[in-house]
Curated annotation (Swiss-Prot):
GO term, biological process aspect, one: cell differentiation
Residue(s) carrying Phosphoserine: 15-16, 24, 26, 28
Stretches in topological domain Cytoplasmic: 1-101, 163-168, 250-269, 332-376, 443-446, 602-610, 689-722
Protein name: Solute carrier organic anion transporter family member 4C1
Known catalytic reactions: estrone 3-sulfate(out) = estrone 3-sulfate(in); L-thyroxine(out) = L-thyroxine(in); 3,3',5-triiodo-L-thyronine(out) = 3,3',5-triiodo-L-thyronine(in); chenodeoxycholate(out) = chenodeoxycholate(in)
Native source species: Mus musculus
Molecular functions per Gene Ontology: organic anion transmembrane transporter activity
Induction of its expression: Dramatically down-regulated 1 day after gonadectomy.
Summary of the function given for this chain in its UniProt record: Mediates the transport of organic anions such as steroids (estrone 3-sulfate, chenodeoxycholate, glycocholate) and thyroid hormones (3,3',5-triiodo-L-thyronine (T3), L-thyroxine (T4)), in the kidney. Capable of transporting cAMP and pharmacological substances such as digoxin, ouabain and methotrexate. Transport is independent of sodium, chloride ion, and ATP. Transport activity is stimulated by an acidic extracellular environment due to increased substrate affinity to the transporter. The driving force for this transport activity is currently not known.
Membrane topology: Multi-pass membrane protein
Tissue expression remark: Strongly expressed in initial segment of epididymis and seminal vesicles.
InterPro entries listed in its UniProt record: Kazal_dom, Kazal_dom_sf, MFS_dom, MFS_trans_sf, OATP
Biased composition (Polar residues): 25-46
Length: 722
């Protein structure tokens, strides 16, 4: 193989601007045969025209002047396979990882790390960051959105230029940026000094002067910009992961296995938040300044307690950077990619509006080609329908991921921590199981593009029917003093203050629910008029409460205390049924995720796959994940019956919701989004027109068929014919 002399690892030879039309002897070869018109018999004539060329060119490249004029590396610009390693260093032990399974393992580890940081550690640390750096919720909300903003801005450009580039190296860059973003996000802890404890707040009824309104701001809030920078860096790293990484997996495995591999990879990104929540929750039980110790009388139940939120980000930084070297050692294409591509058939959607394709092999290397490529994608009606269906699904999934714990907490009277645990136990395993099942079924039955869309339509239909579980799981509001119940007839409905607590000067900004022995729930011990408490009991108990009517009974329990910390035990028993049905709903919802991704990869031109994923994720965030929590928040706020109002008269968070109205509103938005999803899925099925049978997929355009074959097969045929 004289033509490859001097190239020890073709994967690391830079491609030249000019791509040769022929490559006579290279580790992998691309032959282009122009077809004047599409053959009605499945394209047999173009194959016959290739045979004489193959048989007459087994000679060294020196006999082919056009090819020899180009640099050796340019012969491999389209498809470069090579060993695993760095330049001239290719240890044999690394070659075991030079497989689709080896790449998938590292892809899963990076997706897991990204999920742990972005959707796990960041979310669970937001409330702690608010308190530590004295930020408003609007600022922390912008911190959370910064990741999606970065992803939207970069996704199109990264996916467009990365499609023709070295995708594993792009993922090495992604590992670096994810690690750097996690490191930057933790930096405020090291530069803001030691956390200073404030004075403890007495939650019982005390006669004192009313608190004064203070609108001063703290310099600590300036660390907001550091947190935003960290999120922007994390978004920069996440962009290649879900666009170029997915396309690389699709390149490296047969069509029927692609959905399985993609489903496994996506399931890891879903399991990441679960690990992030568990890890972050455990770290929050450690005091924030672990190196300086803590006061012996400070416990987690104290409102002044802050946990060590920053440790998880340092661990993620180290783990993400440990993946840089493994990704950098992969070749541009895994061994065997040429044969896999040669065996694939095209499923690209065909119609008049998308018939324009590019026969220039250099297309996609210049920024001037970017608008044309995007325009060509936007003309693909099937692609647009599939993307719109995913945006509708993303809207409700992100909305429920954000507010499902709040729904469970209010409907079933649970604590915030336990409600969050139950919500995570339903959402995360259900989503991961759905992704894997969807990929397994599509792979097992070797579904074509249209069948995968039909499969997604069916699963969405089942999820639509199951969405009505919110109506049957609704629970009546428990009696609440000042909201749904009066203070023994002495107070007014809708007013927490009554004659029994008028002298306590209670704060509505301090919500600490209390269950009285009369079965009525109170906003706080102060609003219940409680004067004394016993803190060494679990839960904390209160007595001498002027607003609680003491029942005269002979039971010891009634004389033990008048109220205990926490919400009253709900009389609603629908929680197990709700969790079971909602778990099944989540499975069917996410079963459509992998088939839709596979359909998008199949219905667009082969060279536009990464860009198609970039467009999908950009629109998915602009129309789904960014507005989703906002829309859900507005809808849930519309069901509020008691708002937090501070000393300055500024409305804050909602304390009490109308459970029945909340259930109905969530059903309405779920059904609406599911109907939109089903509509666009069905429209994509109707509009889809597959290419004629036998059309090859390997770097093909509509009027050009590019057959990818290995040089070993070329030489074998030449010897047989000679």
């Amino acid at each position: 193989m004289q033509g490859s002399k001097g190239i020890e690892n073709p994967a690391f030879v830079p491609s030249s601007p000019g791509t040769p039309r022929r490559a006579s002897a290279s580790p992998s070869q691309v032959e282009v045969s122009a077809v004047a018109s599409r053959n009605q018999n499945g394209g047999s004539q173009p194959r016959e025209s290739e045979e004489p060329q193959k048989s007459t060119e087994p000679s060294p490249p020196s006999s082919n002047p056009p090819a020899s004029d180009e640099p050796p590396g340019s012969q491999l610009s389209e498809l470069e396979e090579g060993p695993c390693g760095w330049r001239g260093f290719h240890p044999q032990c690394l070659q075991r990882c030079n497989t689709p399974q080896g790449f998938l393992l590292h892809y899963c580890l990076l997706a897991l790390t990204q999920g742990i940081v972005v959707n796990g550690l960041v979310n669970i640390s937001i409330s702690t960051i608010e308190k530590r750096y004295e930020m408003k919720s609007s600022l922390t909300g912008l911190i959370s959105s910064s990741y999606d903003i970065s992803f939207c801005v970069l996704s199109l450009f990264v996916s467009f230029f990365g499609e023709r580039g070295h995708k594993p190296r792009w993922l090495a860059f992604a590992s670096f940026m994810i690690g750097l973003g996690a490191l930057v996000f933790s930096l405020p802890h090291f530069f803001s000094g030691r956390y200073e404890l404030g004075s403890i707040f007495e939650d019982t009824c005390l006669t004192r002067n009313s608190t004064r309104c203070s609108s001063s701001t703290s310099l600590l809030s300036n660390y907001f910009y550091v947190f935003v920078l960290g999120q922007l860096l994390l978004g920069t790293g996440g962009t290649p992961l879900y666009t170029l990484g997915t396309a690389f997996i699709d390149d490296s495995v047969p069509t029927h296995k692609s959905s399985l591999y993609i489903g496994i990879g996506y399931s890891m990104s879903i399991l990441g938040p679960a690990i992030g929540y568990v890890l972050g929750g455990q770290l929050l039980t450690m005091y924030i300044d672990i190196a300086m110790g803590q006061s012996s009388d400070l416990t987690e139940d104290d409102p002044r307690w802050l946990g060590a939120w920053w440790i998880g980000f340092l661990l993620a930084w180290l783990f993400a950077w440990s993946l840089i070297m493994p990704f950098s050692c992969f070749p541009k294409h895994l061994p065997g990619t040429a044969k896999i591509q040669a065996g694939k058939t095209s499923q690209t959607h065909q119609n008049n509006s998308t018939s324009f394709q590019h026969t220039d092999e250099n297309f996609g290397k210049s920024i001037k080609d970017f608008p044309t490529a995007v325009k060509n994608l936007m003309r693909n009606t099937v692609f647009i329908c599939l993307v719109l269906s995913t945006t509708s699904e993303a809207l409700i999934t992100t909305g429920f991921a954000t507010f499902l714990p709040k729904f469970i907490e209010n409907q079933f009277g649970l604590t915030s921590s336990f409600a969050a645990t139950l919500g995570g136990a339903v959402l995360i395993p259900g989503a991961a199981l759905g992704q894997i099942l969807g990929g397994v079924l599509v792979s097992k039955f070797k579904m074509k593009c249209k069948n995968t869309m039909k499969f997604a339509l069916c699963t969405s239909g089942v999820a639509l029917v199951l969405s009505f579980v919110f109506i049957y799981a609704k629970c009546e509001n428990e009696p609440f003093a000042g909201v749904s119940e009066s203070y023994n007839g002495t107070g007014e409905m809708g007013n927490l203050t009554a004659p029994c607590n008028a002298n306590c000067n209670c704060l509505r900004s301090y919500y600490y629910p209390l269950c009285g022995s009369d079965g009525i729930q109170y906003f706080s011990p102060c609003f219940a008029g409680c004067l004394n408490s016993v803190s060494n009991r679990k839960p904390k108990v209160y007595y001498n409460c002027s607003c609680i009517e003491r029942k005269i009974t002979s039971t010891a329990e009634s004389t033990d205390f008048e109220a205990k910390a926490g919400k009253c035990r709900t009389r609603c028993s629908n929680l197990p049924i709700f969790l079971g049905i909602f778990f099944i709903t989540v499975i069917f919802t996410f079963m459509a995720g992998t088939p839709i991704t596979v359909s998008i990869l199949r219905c667009v031109n082969h060279r536009h796959r990464s860009l198609a994923l970039g467009v999908q994720f950009m629109l998915l965030r602009l129309l789904g994940t960014i507005p989703g929590p906002i829309i859900f928040g507005v809808i849930i706020d519309s069901t509020c019956v008691l708002w937090d109002v501070n000393e300055c008269g500024i409305k804050g968070a909602c304390w009490i919701y109308d459970n029945i109205k909340m259930a109905h509103m969530l059903v309405a938005i779920s059904v609406t989004c599911k109907v939109i999803t089903i509509f666009f899925n069905g429209l994509a099925i109707v509009l889809y027109k597959p290419p004629p049978p036998g059309t090859e997929v390997s770097f093909q355009s509509q009027n050009v068929i590019v057959s990818t074959i290995s040089v070993e097969e070329d030489l074998d045929k030449a010897e047989n014919e000679g």
